[in-house]
């Protein structure tokens, strides 16, 4: 196999379709190969609190525009080669709004340079810490009690559209869609979570903030790096996982193969895992203040349809109809339209070490549960985001606690979550096991990109 540096063929940024064919003297040319879509843009990374580094610069881009939350802050000259780097000093930037984290992006500018934009990098919070929390996570009533700065906040559903006091609050106001290398991904900013538990390690309360919080008794504060969450269910093309609109979700693939297809995209990619899944789950609980996801939206009780069904919604969260396709914070099918495999749990153990995914682990352990109503999530203070099933209630009506079904057992089992049935035990916190090699016509996955 011969590799080729695509920079010498590619226009300055943008997207191009590349194909190839074999030629040899005395032989007929081969047919063209499959088409590969190559997308190029500048890359942005944080060097330290005062410096950002632009890589994959282009000679044709004589300058780079620097944006903070979409507002032009600076234009920095570039006179280097294709593939070069450029450091940007942001120490002198001023900001017009306190109480916000700023997402920095850059664009290359120059004659013949196609439209482009880097990934977003978040920089420090300006203003006082704002803490949004809920308690009551180990009570039989599904409703939660708002705490800290979330007291008095609310949300409403009208004509299948959600209006929420959290739309303007961190981190929800920064959960926007970005197009990165052809994928549609939702940005989750760097944040802190305060996670509380009782003497048995069962989850009792959770809070989110942009700055570190003080941990009280039986509480732990954890820092979460920024990451991207797939805006759509996973699709697979050419042995690689994508998050794209206008294509069918991929089913009938094992958890292990989904893992392989995600990693084929690069070292920073992975399929949905327990660690990142719980970050989103906790943010959902804080916004809606209920363990009963059905009380917010049910999601489509099937596994059909094309990705992008909710693209015409003009708000971050809503549904096409009661019980129809839904999205939350621009994440389509966050509940419903099929189950989704997630990594990080195997048999009766869990880990956040990606190198251990798909094998027996014991960083966090839990007991078998034979198909009942989930009553509690259990945490370990060393791994507080690996919230695993911690209790159950024999309640076939599923009208207490989390109101979702849980089944977990020892051996070579992997796990999925979500909804594709219309039963009351389906929902956001459903936890069900599969043989590791199993596939299903209603179980897919989702792409993550870490930073």
Locate the predicted segments by residue:
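Recognizes extended acidic, P/S/T-rich segments that occur
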Residues: 1-12, 65-98
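Ser/Thr- and Asn-enriched, surface-exposed coil loops between beta-strands
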Residues: 3-5, 46-53, 60, 80-84, ...
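Beta-strand-rich modules
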Residues: 10-26, 93-113
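Pro/Thr/Ser/Gly-rich low-complexity, intrinsically disordered linker/stalk tracts
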Residues: 27-59, 113-127
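Short beta-strand/loop motifs in extracellular/secreted proteins, especially
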Residues: 60-65, 102
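GGW-centered surface loops in extracellular recognition modules
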Residues: 127-189, 193-196, 269
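Short aromatic-cysteine micro-motif
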Residues: 181, 208-334
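C-terminal, surface-exposed recognition/capping segments
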Residues: 275-278, 300-311, 317-318, 325, ...
């Amino acid at each position: 196999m011969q590799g080729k540096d695509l920079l010498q063929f590619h226009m300055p940024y943008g997207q191009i379709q590349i194909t190839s064919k074999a030629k040899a003297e005395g032989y007929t040319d081969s047919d063209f190969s499959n088409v590969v879509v190559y997308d190029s843009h500048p890359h942005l990374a944080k060097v330290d609190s005062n410096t950002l580094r632009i890589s994959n610069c282009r000679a044709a881009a004589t300058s780079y525009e620097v944006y903070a939350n979409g507002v032009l802050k600076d234009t920095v000259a570039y006179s280097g080669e294709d593939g070069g780097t450029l450091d940007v000093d942001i120490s002198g930037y001023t900001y017009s709004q306190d109480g916000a984290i700023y997402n920095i992006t850059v664009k290359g500018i120059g004659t013949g340079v196609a439209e482009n934009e880097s990934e977003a990098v978040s920089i420090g919070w300006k203003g006082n810490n704002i803490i949004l929390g809920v308690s009551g996570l180990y009570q039989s009533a599904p409703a939660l009690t708002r705490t800290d700065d979330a007291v008095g906040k609310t949300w409403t559903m009208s004509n299948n559209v959600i209006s929420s006091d959290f739309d303007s609050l961190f981190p929800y106001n920064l959960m926007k869609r970005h197009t990165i290398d052809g994928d549609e991904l939702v940005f989750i900013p760097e944040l802190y979570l305060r996670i509380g538990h009782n003497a048995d390690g069962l989850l009792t309360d959770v809070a989110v903030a942009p700055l570190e919080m003080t941990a009280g008794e039986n509480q732990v504060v954890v820092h979460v790096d920024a990451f991207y969450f797939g805006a759509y269910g996973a699709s697979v093309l050419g042995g690689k996982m994508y998050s794209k609109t206008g294509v069918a979700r991929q089913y009938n693939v094992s958890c292990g193969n989904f893992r392989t297809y995600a990693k084929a995209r690069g070292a920073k990619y992975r399929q949905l895992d327990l660690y990142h899944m719980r970050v989103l789950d906790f943010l959902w609980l804080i916004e809606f203040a209920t363990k009963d996801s059905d009380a917010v939206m049910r999601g489509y009780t099937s596994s059909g349809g094309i990705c992008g069904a909710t693209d015409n919604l003009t708000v971050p969260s809503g549904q096409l109809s009661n019980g129809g396709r839904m999205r939350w914070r621009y994440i389509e099918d966050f509940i419903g339209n099929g189950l989704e495999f997630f990594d990080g749990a195997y048999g009766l153990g869990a880990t956040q070490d990606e190198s251990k995914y798909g094998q027996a682990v014991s960083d966090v352990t839990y007991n078998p549960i034979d198909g009942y109503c989930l009553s509690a999530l259990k945490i370990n203070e060393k791994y507080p985001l690996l919230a695993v099933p911690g209790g159950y209630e024999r309640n076939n009506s599923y009208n207490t606690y989390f109101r979702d079904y849980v089944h977990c057992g020892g051996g070579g089992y992997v796990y999925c979550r979500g909804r594709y049935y219309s039963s009351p035990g389906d929902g956001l916190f459903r936890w069900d096991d599969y043989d590791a090699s199993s596939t299903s016509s209603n179980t897919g996955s989702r792409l993550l990109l870490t930073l």
